[in-house]
Amino acid sequence: MKNVLITGGAGFIGFNLTKRLIDCGYNITILDNLSKKIHSSNIRYIKLKDITHFIIGDVCNRADWEKAICNQDVIIHLAAETGTGQSMYDIHNYTNVNVGATAMMLDVLTNSKNSVKKIILASSRAV
């Protein structure tokens, strides 16, 4: 059975992907910050917390990545700031999360012992 890390797993795409992969027999770990902007009701978190290993953390934080990649075979990196309009005036934050977090992931994978064999990256239109 494969271990899959999904960043942004409590978002719309991540939530639906998580359910599908669990149905197919995968072990899922989610790394998500549960941003109030996206997850005001936390309904997806409530549905996922008992069927996944759920890490409430930040994809811009090295320690959260190091914790999340432990024993993973695949990373599906969906975490991103969303909203094209907001990305036009909150440039630093969007760049930090949507580009910087991916760089952080690659740095952690390159410089630590891990079992990750595949990365799937889905980007936001707000990059």
Where are these regions (language model features)?
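N-terminal Rossmann-like NAD(P)+-binding domain of SDR-like oxidoreductases, especially those catalyzing
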Residues: M1-V127
